[in-house]
């Protein structure tokens, strides 16, 4: 294997970030994991964020309805697009590549999904969701996400962001810290979702 190749370097980035002992990385990966049964998956997490903004900003019923409809369409279209591309490209997951070429003992911080790696559904839908919220609230709105505040299995303390862009970037990078996506995938997926 060519250790100077782009793919090898991407895999090493996943490996290094996954093994980093900094609890911040682990907390981010777990906070944005959004497994079923906790926040209703990534889409559910973004709907709870939207609801927090609706309440905080005092949106009227018609304004809230517009946000929820646009958000629902955007995240569903994002996931449809992402999964079409996943099976078009059928790209290998970091865990598979790392096991095969670097470290057969490697394990991810969060569960590695049983479908192709590229693009990242979380990043794709995060980009789409935050673009919708920006169209209603502007990007510079600060947000404190308390979606996971009552969870005891992870550090669910509310997370505060100075902008929606900052939040979407954290959602995206959390997948690298979880060990389930390559950095290049995250960057491309977030950019696609924003379009």
What are these regions (language model features)?
Residues 1-195:
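Acidic/polar surface patches and capping/hinge elements
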